[in-house]
């Protein structure tokens, strides 16, 4: 344990030294990110090593101490040190877990209507509102990238960006199928309808992670259309980009400017290519899947929102809240906290069995 902690200490100090000498912006960014990730661990290591040294000194002194009062004080000092070291060792179980490679990234969140017709479209809008309110409470910037309104206040699809180094860690468990059970306002018989929407959480790609060559793209432009299919723009401002090597297709029509739509489409394209690369890696490694709370796949049913009963259930961890109204207002802290804790427990268990 001590050897491992001293190596972490050395690594942190080496990165700090490299930061003082680095001039390349890309290197500086990576070094700052790595040091920021290591800082909480480094501070705990410093604390642990100091207590460990103090305990060792006390153990040496107690061997030759003849005074009863002093002997008793040293014994108590050793006991307290042992308790502190045990607490820190439990914290290290979490801090020493391998970092998620996507932690610290900005993300794109994509919500699409699934089964359920107009009700599904309305719930897409409800989920976007829920996520926006949660992001606002966390002081995270939200930017709509593209959306397709239904004309009755719903959305066929919406893609939005969340820009903050906490965004991925807070939203990474949202991917999958979200099911809603409620009585539509148009339902005169009071029957409960079930509909579903899918959520995808896409980490934004760094330039070095996804390099897109212009020659690999087919770019089509067309007139954007609004709810019901009517054309809302008389110029060809909407953009569809096909990445020929992967077959990934992205369309964007939210902006009136073709240039802005192209820039947004390229942003989505980069994230989707990164997602495809991650999926390919997942298929090659079952071990990664076992470490996750669910797969994050669009087809996996992750949560049910039952409005008549005021209940929200996350099926992956058996979490149930009977305060659905608060959740829909963006009060997601308890739910996300439970998912994060369960993920930590599973990862710790996984490391202990290897």
Swiss-Prot record:
Keyword Cytoplasm: yes
GO terms under cellular component: cytoplasm
Chain positions found as N5-methylglutamine: 230
Subcellular location: Cytoplasm
Signal peptide extent: none
Maturation and modification: Methylated by PrmC. Methylation increases the termination efficiency of RF1.
Assigned protein family: Belongs to the prokaryotic/mitochondrial release factor family.
Job of this protein: Peptide chain release factor 1 directs the termination of translation in response to the peptide chain termination codons UAG and UAA.
HAMAP family in the cross-refs: Rel_fac_1
Name by which UniProt lists this protein: Peptide chain release factor 1
Source species: Leptospira interrogans serogroup Icterohaemorrhagiae serovar Lai (strain 56601)
Lineage: Bacteria, Pseudomonadati, Spirochaetota, Spirochaetia, Leptospirales
């Amino acid at each position: 344990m001590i050897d491992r902690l001293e190596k972490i200490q050395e690594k942190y100090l080496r990165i700090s030294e490299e930061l003082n000498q680095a001039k390349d912006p890309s290197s500086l960014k990576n070094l700052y990110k790595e040091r920021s990730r290591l800082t909480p661990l480094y501070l705990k290591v410093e604390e642990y090593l100091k207590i460990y040294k103090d305990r060792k000194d006390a153990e040496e002194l107690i061997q030759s101490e003849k005074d009863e009062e002093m002997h008793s004080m040293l014994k108590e000092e050793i006991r307290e040190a042992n308790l502190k070291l045990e607490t820190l060792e439990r914290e290290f179980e979490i801090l020493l877990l391998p970092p998620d490679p996507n932690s610290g990234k900005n993300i794109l969140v994509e919500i699409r209507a699934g089964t359920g017709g107009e009700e599904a479209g309305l719930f897409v809008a409800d989920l976007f509102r829920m996520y926006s309110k949660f992001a606002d409470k966390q002081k995270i910037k939200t930017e709509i990238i593209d959306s397709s309104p239904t004309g009755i206040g719903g959305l066929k699809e919406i893609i939005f960006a969340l820009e903050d180094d906490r965004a991925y860690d807070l939203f990474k468990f949202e991917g999958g199928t979200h099911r809603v059970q409620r009585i539509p306002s148009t339902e005169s018989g009071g029957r409960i309808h079930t509909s579903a929407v899918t959520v995808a959480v896409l980490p934004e790609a760094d330039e070095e992670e996804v390099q897109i060559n212009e020659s690999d793209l087919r770019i089509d432009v067309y007139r954007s259309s609004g709810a019901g299919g009517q054309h809302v723009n008389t110029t060809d401002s909407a953009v569809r980009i096909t990445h020929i090597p992967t077959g990934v297709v992205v369309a964007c029509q939210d902006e009136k400017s073709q240039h802005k739509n192209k820039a947004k489409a390229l942003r989505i394209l980069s994230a989707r290519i990164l997602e495809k690369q991650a999926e390919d890696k997942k298929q090659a490694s079952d071990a990664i899947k076992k470490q996750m709370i669910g797969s994050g796949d669009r087809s996996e049913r992750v949560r049910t929102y039952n409005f008549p009963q005021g209940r929200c259930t996350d099926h992956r961890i058996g979490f149930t809240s009977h305060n659905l109204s608060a959740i829909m207002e963006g009060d997601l802290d308890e739910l996300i906290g439970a998912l994060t804790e369960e993920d930590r427990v599973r990862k710790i268990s996984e490391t202990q069995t290897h």
